[in-house]
Amino acid sequence: YKELDFQKKNIIIIIMESLSSEYVGALNQGKGHTPFIDSLMQNSLVFKNAFSSGLKSIEAIPSITASMPTFMDNPLITSNYAQNNFESLASLLNEEGYKSSFFHGVFNGTMSFDSFCKKVGFQEYYGLEEYFFGRWEKYRKMEDYDGTWGIYDEEFFDYYYDYLKTEQEPFFSTFFSATLHTPLVIPEKYKDIFTKEKKVHQ
């Protein structure tokens, strides 16, 4: 690839926690809850068949960012091998002059995502601590915390958007959502939208 004319466009990877195909209308005969994703899929290259090299989130991050499939019972991130040197999309793009970042709105240190991301070359990591104690005061609201995992995805996506607007280009950034993880805490502002028969978390 070094001999090719490399166009330095911004690259964003969005990893959606627990978003099964049954929730995506474009993959479920129009029955779903993701109209925006459905609209993107109409103008995108979509792979309807895929091979997963891990079963859990802790296995997905090494697989997606560093092409490291799951070989062991113990996840790579929490194993002794986590201290090895790895090439990753971040480290390779850093060499091309990219600014790299990883966003996951949970407590820093959860599943060692932050330390792994730094190990494989992500220059910046943004989690719950950066959200509450970072540069934007408007994001320092306790009601944005779901009481279990971290920041609600809606608010963390807004935070991410504000970050990308000010980011140095070209950039490579990965966003890993969290809210769809059990126990599926519904924000107060949305609790009365669903009738009892249609509550998604029951």
Predicted regions and their residues:
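Solvent-exposed soluble domains appended to multi-pass membrane proteins
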Residues: Y1-Q202
